[in-house]
Amino acid sequence: MSKVKVHAGICGFVSNIKVNKTEGKNAKVKIVSACGMIKDLSNEMTEINWINSMTREMANSEVYKITDKYITHAACPVPSAILKAVEVEFGLALPKDVTMKIEKD
């Protein structure tokens, strides 16, 4: 199982993502969050195919197609975090934290 904890930023929501490889190219996805949009997303995104998520243009990724139905904030980091968990779970990347430092001068 691969896990990602997302502190989304100014919204204050934390999302916990778990991806668990099942058969072939499929994985179970479990997302827990207090964000209503992420909760709605998690109700549909319970299983994904890594090929349909990782090897398509961003707009055609299974993750982003489902995300587009529920999340109205384009800069939400959760969809990217789901893909990062998928990468790690299927051995496409090593587990490594991603950091964004945002400043305004």
State where each predicted segment sits.
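Generic preference for hydrophobic/aromatic residues in regular secondary structure cores
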Residues: 17-19, 63, 99-102
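Glycine-rich beta-alpha junction loops
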Residues: 10, 33-35, 86
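Short, charged/polar N-terminal "headpieces" of proteins
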Residues: 1-27
